[in-house]
From Swiss-Prot:
Cofactor(s) in the UniProt record: Zn(2+)
Binding site residues for Zn(2+): 196, 198, 203, 245
One biological process term in Gene Ontology: D-galacturonate catabolic process
NCBIfam families: PRK00924.1
Gene from which the chain derives: kduI
Protein name: 4-deoxy-L-threo-5-hexosulose-uronate ketol-isomerase
Highest taxon, organism lineage: Bacteria
Length: 278
């Protein structure tokens, strides 16, 4: 488990390129036949990936020991979105078939979660966010047909994108975790511009569906102290509440966003005008 400490905005603005990457970038999300796990002190979110190929991968008691509990989800909820081939997730003996861009919410208290791919030639890639939970909501599969899509932006401003809301109150109940998938239209490069912060939530972006020769310049920092981190395919970045979170790519891309914090009101944002950015 890779543990990341919280960081003050006054400290963050003094960091060089490698310093920013060390604090906020999750460089390797998927490793064959393993789970990756980054634990952030910011709202206690855990992010990572699971790519089973030649064997199943389980997340159980060994992680619980690191968290001071008997098993991983004893006091946590889990959200998973599959960006790879078809797979299965078995929760305490109940098997769910999770296809490409299907998702699974796992409620607090589940003791054993086992991940598998159906075809080793096209393995599943399970990206997950995990957050502290105060009560148990039912485990539920969510398909792309069930999400709440919203299309925003314009081709003229190169930010035409569709936001697919997987884990939001309109789709299912969670304690605090919200997740979704945003896909840019072909030829569009910007996400979340004009940008915003949200004092009451933190967020993690996971960029994927990118060519090897492409990258995204992920914008971060306070609106008057902006910085950037260069992101490549299948990498994630942690965004504290005080930071903007926006990006511009060399080509169109897709990203998964996950939020935890005070509320689940999607539009609870502190908007920043482009003219006010520095």
């Amino acid at each position: 488990m890779d543990v990341r400490q919280s960081i003050h905005s006054a400290h963050a603005k003094t960091l060089d390129t490698q310093g920013l990457r060390n604090e906020f970038l999750v460089e390797e999300v998927f490793v064959a036949d393993e789970y990756t796990m980054v634990y952030s002190h910011i709202d206690r979110i855990i992010v990572g990936g699971i790519m089973p190929i030649t064997k199943t991968v389980s997340v159980g008691g060994e992680v619980g020991k690191q968290l001071g509990v008997s098993h991983f989800l004893e006091r946590r909820e889990l959200g998973v979105i599959n960006i790879g081939g078809a797979g299965t997730i078995t929760v305490d003996g109940q098997c769910y078939e999770i296809g490409h861009r299907d998702a699974l919410y796992v409620g607090k208290g589940a003791k054993e979660v086992v991940f598998a791919s159906i075809d080793t030639a096209t393995p599943a890639k399970f990206y997950y966010n995990c957050a502290p939970a105060h009560t148990t909501y039912p485990t539920k599969k969510v398909t792309p047909d069930e999400v709440s899509p919203v299309t925003l932006g314009d081709n003229l401003t190169s930010n035409r994108r569709t936001i697919n809301k997987y884990f939001v109150p309109d789709v299912l109940e969670t304690c605090q975790l919200s997740m979704g998938l945003t896909e840019l239209a072909p030829g569009n490069l910007w996400n979340t511009m004009p940008c915003h912060t949200h004092e009451r939530r933190m967020e993690v972006y996971f960029y994927f569906n990118m060519d090897d020769d492409a990258c995204v310049f992920h914008m971060m920092g306070q609106p008057q102290e902006t910085r950037h981190i260069v992101m490549h395919n299948e990498q994630a970045v942690i965004s504290p509440s005080w930071s903007i979170h926006s990006g511009v790519g060399t080509k169109a891309y897709t990203f998964i966003w996950g939020m935890v914090g005070e509320n689940q009101v999607f539009d609870d944002m502190d908007h920043v005008a482009v003219k006010d950015l520095r």
